């Protein structure tokens, strides 16, 4: 941009500003966002409140805009093309007004801290500072040209005053200076803020909160125990702070040789002088499976209390009903067994009576046949038992044994119940073994262990489990670096007593 401020140069200025804003809003699309064309607020501090009233007056009770088709919308690029940002028409403030309006709308649309939220906030800061610089540059150029013209006129008239009066300012100069004052009075850099939480040992602070100055929403605290602190800027940057080097004596620059040395921490370097890692939010890394998936700090009832309430209200009732069913089933089984035993005893008594009345010779022949048949069956069973494949014996492991209860539970679709019962039983056996001070697990414990392992393996293979993303809680600030210790204190050396000669 050249330093002349003629009509053609102002047009070039608008074209250049439009190209810069288009390049800056490639990712956030601020210059292409639509907004009401008829809305305009002269006071830059009341743009947000006036826009809320403007929308509320045109909305119904449900919050929907009445006659939305008739609402005329425009964009910043369209206004650039229509020439509505001419400096002679107060274009600097109009452009700042539209940029602030669109950025405010987008800031309240995106959640706090997101990438788009930060991009819109950066665009607002960049464009506001760009307009302030250009206002100042063009205003200075106008002042210089008008000053030259006024000097030449005053020299011709015989007045040799070199001062630049307000009467010499043109209408364009006044409009630009007025727009500059309005923008500079409204645009402010927000104070940085951080989260603070007080723990048992020390206070922990988070990184700087990325909240925009345009955001009128309340702070979304990650926890009710957190507080917000303002990070005040350092004003005395030019004055170097004194370091903990030497502590000079108060009486003289030359220390007294009889006193102990006043040198303290000569080689001390403060940790803040290094680029050390600061407090960051919790990142679990390889321990994601152990990380909590939800935060119970803001809840009235935690998971332990909910479990106790469930156990008292529902769990004990379920156990009571199950125990009643078991007792009834055992009673039915006992009654059935007693009836069967009575029938068998009656039949045996009848058979004994019939055999005693029969012929004894037939009984002798039958006994011989029975002994022969039993001997043959025993020989075949022994042959079948001794036929074992060595390959199967070599590949056999304790986990290969499958019980009938496992097959039945898989058929009924209740393997989780069998796993729970087995784990409870395993826990009880382990507790008894530890109380008896027995280190080696029993055979029953080993069988239960392999049983649970086998069932879980079958369930995982059947379900084809894949990795599922888990959202872990990160609302816990962690202090990465902590420096313990204290400043060493100079100890006074005891003076030696001089021996006086008698």
From Swiss-Prot:
Record-linked InterPro entries: Bromodomain, Bromodomain-like_sf, Engrailed_Homeobox_TFs
PROSITE patterns (UniProt xref): BROMODOMAIN_2
GO biological process annotation, one example: transcription elongation by RNA polymerase II
Chief subcellular location: nucleus
Residue runs in coiled coils: none
Domain of life: Eukaryota
GO CC entries: chromatin; nucleus; RSC-type complex
Keyword Protein biosynthesis: no
Biased composition (Basic and acidic residues): 339-353
Cellular localization per UniProt: Nucleus
Record key words, sorted: Bromodomain, Chromatin regulator, Nucleus, Transcription, Transcription regulation
Ranges for region Disordered: 336-378
Remaining remarks: Present with 4460 molecules/cell in log phase SD medium.
Its job: Component of the chromatin structure-remodeling complex (RSC), which is involved in transcription regulation and nucleosome positioning. RSC is responsible for the transfer of a histone octamer from a nucleosome core particle to naked DNA. The reaction requires ATP and involves an activated RSC-nucleosome intermediate. Remodeling reaction also involves DNA translocation, DNA twist and conformational change.
Description of how the protein assembles with itself and partners: Component of the two forms of the RSC complex composed of at least either RSC1 or RSC2, and ARP7, ARP9, LDB7, NPL6, RSC3, RSC30, RSC4, RSC58, RSC6, RSC8, RSC9, SFH1, STH1, HTL1 and probably RTT102. The complexes interact with histone and histone variant components of centromeric chromatin.
Protein name per the record: Chromatin structure-remodeling complex protein RSC58
Species this protein is from: Saccharomyces cerevisiae (strain ATCC 204508 / S288c) (Baker's yeast)
Gene: RSC58
């Amino acid at each position: 941009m050249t330093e002349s401020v003629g009509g053609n140069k102002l047009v070039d200025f608008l074209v250049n500003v439009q190209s810069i804003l288009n390049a800056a809003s490639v990712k956030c699309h601020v210059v292409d966002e639509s907004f009401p064309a008829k809305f305009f607020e002269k006071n830059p501090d009341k743009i947000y409140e006036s826009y809320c009233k403007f929308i509320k007056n045109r909305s119904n009770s449900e919050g929907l805009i009445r006659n939305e088709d008739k609402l005329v919308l425009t964009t910043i690029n369209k206004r650039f093309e229509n020439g509505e940002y001419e400096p002679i028409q107060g274009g600097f403030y109009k452009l700042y007004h539209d940029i602030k309006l669109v950025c405010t709308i987008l800031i309240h649309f995106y959640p706090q801290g997101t990438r788009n939220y930060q991009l819109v906030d950066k665009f607002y800061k960049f464009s506001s500072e760009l307009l302030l610089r250009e206002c100042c540059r063009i205003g200075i150029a106008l002042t210089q040209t008008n000053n030259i013209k006024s000097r030449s006129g005053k020299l011709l008239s015989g007045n040799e005053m070199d001062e630049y009066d307000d009467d010499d300012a043109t209408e364009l100069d006044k409009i630009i200076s007025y727009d500059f004052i309005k923008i500079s009075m409204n645009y402010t850099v927000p104070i940085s803020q951080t989260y603070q939480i007080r723990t048992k040992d020390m206070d922990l602070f988070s990184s700087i909160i990325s909240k925009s100055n345009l955001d009128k929403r309340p702070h979304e605290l990650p926890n009710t125990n957190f507080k917000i602190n303002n990070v005040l800027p350092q004003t005395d940057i030019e004055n170097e702070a004194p370091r903990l080097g030497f502590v000079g004596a108060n009486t003289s620059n030359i220390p007294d040789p009889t006193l102990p040395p006043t040198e303290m921490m000569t080689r001390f370097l403060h940790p803040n002088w290094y680029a050390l890692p600061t407090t960051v939010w919790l990142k679990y890394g390889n321990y994601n499976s152990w990380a909590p998936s939800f935060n119970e700090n803001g809840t009235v009832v935690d998971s332990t209390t909910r479990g106790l309430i469930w156990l008292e209200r529902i769990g004990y009732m379920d156990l009571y009903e199950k125990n009643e069913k078991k007792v009834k089933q055992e009673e039915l089984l006992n009654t059935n067994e007693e009836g069967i035993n009575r029938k068998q005893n009656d039949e045996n008594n009848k058979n004994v009576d019939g055999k005693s009345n029969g012929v004894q010779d037939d009984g002798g022949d039958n006994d011989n046949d029975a002994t022969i048949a039993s001997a043959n069956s025993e020989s075949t069973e022994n042959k079948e038992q001794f036929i074992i494949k060595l390959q199967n014996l070599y590949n056999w492991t304790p986990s290969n044994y499958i019980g009938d209860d496992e097959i039945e539970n898989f058929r009924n679709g209740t393997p989780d119940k069998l796993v729970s019962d087995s784990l409870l039983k395993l826990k009880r056996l382990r507790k008894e073994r530890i109380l008896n001070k027995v280190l080696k697990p029993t055979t029953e414990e080993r069988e239960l262990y392999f049983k649970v392992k086998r069932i879980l393996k079958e369930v995982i293979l059947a379900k084809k489990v894949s990795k599922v993303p888990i959202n872990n809680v990160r609302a816990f600030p962690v202090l990465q670096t902590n420096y313990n210790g204290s400043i060493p204190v100079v100890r006074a050396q005891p003076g030696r007593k001089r021996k006086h000669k008698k």
